[in-house]
Amino acid sequence: MKSVLLIGLGRFGRHLAMQLNELGHQVMAVDRDEERVNECMPFVTNAQIGDSTRVDFLRSLGVSNYDVCYVTISGDFQNSLETTSLLKELGANYVVSRAERDVQAKFLLRNGADAVAYPEKQLAKWAAIRYTANHIFSYIELDEQHAIIEVAVPEDWQGRSIGELDIRRKYGVNILGVKRNGKTDVNISPEIILDGSLTLLVRGENKALKKQFRL
């Protein structure tokens, strides 16, 4: 269980708060809008109304006590940038800030963000791949060069074992798990025979994934 400070309760921030709550983390939610704060109260540990660009307000939250600080302010990049910078100045352990464009990400990373989330960009990429490739069932971007996909077993792999295929050496990707009837097995044995009833969880460089699985 992690302690999380979440600043900015627009649509993305609200959904993030709900997901963090479902995962069992302790969440302190902050927004300057009282209505947004009240809407999030049922699924956060605590919440406060306040201006995150005020150093005295942030200091009162004890930002260094949280494992992760999310900055998910929407519609006001200047506030997001100032908040990110102040969090780091006050000793925040790890700051994840929301960006809508690459230029915003560069400024955030230069001003204290340890990582940047692109909710719209990442969702767009997932939707583009998921709904134009019937054999791809899930897509998770790890960074600009790597991803994890859930994919149908290629026809030329069916009836053969994982060990026989020598997948990592020949194709440059790693099998993380196999999924059958909605259940995932991450204990991968070279003796597993692949067939059309399985899907594979595969990690690799985007170039290798595109080449082998036609993304």
Language model features: what each stretch is:
Residues 1-215:
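Cytosolic regulatory regions of ion transport systems
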